[in-house]
Amino acid sequence: MKIGVIGAGSWGTALANVVAANGHDTTLWAYEPELVTGMAATRVNHLFLPGIELHPGLNYTGALAEAVSGAELVLLVTPTQVMRNLLADLAGSIAPTAILASASKGIELGTLCTVSQICCQVLGDAVRERFVALSGPTFAKEVALGLPSLIVAGSANDAAAHTVQAAFSNPVFRVYTSDDAIGVELGGAVKNVIAIAAGISDGLGFGHNTRAALITRGLAEMKRLGRAMGAQDATFAGLAGMGDLVLTCTGDLSRNRTVGVKLGQGLTLEVIMAEMRMVAEGVKSAESVNALAQKLGVEMPITQKVYEILYGNKPARQAVLELMSRDLKPEQA
């Protein structure tokens, strides 16, 4: 199968490496010209995945049209906030029968659209039947190192989901399918916001009890938003929900948790972001997910407090204490 991967950050590079190692004709597009040149010369992504040699069959390009020309599967792995403009540039080059998959995890600012909704708006509603959301508890570095990992491919089209499953699966990378694309997308977006909250708690030194509570109540927020968007509760109990949430809230490789830890330790967002080369999607998602929750009338208090810390200059300790002093009520999923 001919596959084009758009986005050579750590996650895009790791996924491109998986399908190339599986024997597929794979081309990875990178925005940075020096990254294309460097990967072609050394087979290492020195910017985003240093120290890991990539499969010799993986091809590299800085030309979008070249990356997707003749591709039967196009995988989008860029920050959500640049997705719309990128798709507009790709529109004339993607084959009308190509499966369009996304491993990006976020909600677009302003429009409050998921990636699938952006794809339909830019490329036409027919894309919905060819769209697959790819998400799960996976750190790019561990996938690139060949450590056993599991992920889920969600699509309204069972055949499209199974095509992606077959393309990516191997003895150390197992792919499940789901018919709940919107649930898979939302799980990936919301968990990044909750991971910032968990990191803030850790940075404040609040301990394991607090983190466990944030993860559990964060899952409840994820499910409430999912119901309002037409997702299935079961999705959030699986790899794209609880699985990814636990990993991102506890793993030291989590960029979003790292942002939270530093916020809890007293650093400003500006200083934190200036130190980071790679994107922490949760910073933008806190704004868009909070706005989406307000638009749909969904109660998401943890998400709201993360938003207030990031964009309202609310002290982190005060935000956590405000969560603890909310009206007492029965536990609701």
From Swiss-Prot:
GO molecular function: glycerol-3-phosphate dehydrogenase [NAD(P)+] activity; NAD binding
The protein, known as: Glycerol-3-phosphate dehydrogenase [NAD(P)+]
Recorded name of the encoding gene: gpsA
Active-site positions on this chain: 191 (proton acceptor)
Gene3D superfamilies: N-(1-d-carboxylethyl)-l-norvaline Dehydrogenase, domain 2, NAD(P)-binding Rossmann-like Domain
EC number, UniProt record: 1.1.1.94
Uppermost EC category: oxidoreductase
Keyword Transport: no
Single GO BP term: carbohydrate metabolic process
Keyword NAD: yes
Binding site for NADPH: 10-11, 105, 140, 255, 279, 281
Pathway: Membrane lipid metabolism; glycerophospholipid metabolism
Entry-linked PROSITE patterns: NAD_G3PDH
Cellular compartments annotated: Cytoplasm
Keywords assigned: Cytoplasm, Lipid biosynthesis, Lipid metabolism, NAD, NADP, Nucleotide-binding, Oxidoreductase, Phospholipid biosynthesis, Phospholipid metabolism
Record function comment: Catalyzes the reduction of the glycolytic intermediate dihydroxyacetone phosphate (DHAP) to sn-glycerol 3-phosphate (G3P), the key precursor for phospholipid synthesis.
Catalysis performed (reactions): sn-glycerol 3-phosphate + NAD(+) = dihydroxyacetone phosphate + NADH + H(+); sn-glycerol 3-phosphate + NADP(+) = dihydroxyacetone phosphate + NADPH + H(+)
One Pfam entry name: NAD_Gly3P_dh_C
Binding residue positions for sn-glycerol 3-phosphate: 105, 136, 138, 191, 244, 254-256
Family per record: Belongs to the NAD-dependent glycerol-3-phosphate dehydrogenase family.
GO annotation, cellular component aspect: cytosol
InterPro entries per the UniProt record, alphabetical: 6-PGluconate_DH-like_C_sf, 6PGD_dom2, G3P_DH_NAD-dep, G3P_DH_NAD-dep_C, G3P_DH_NAD-dep_N, NAD(P)-bd_dom_sf
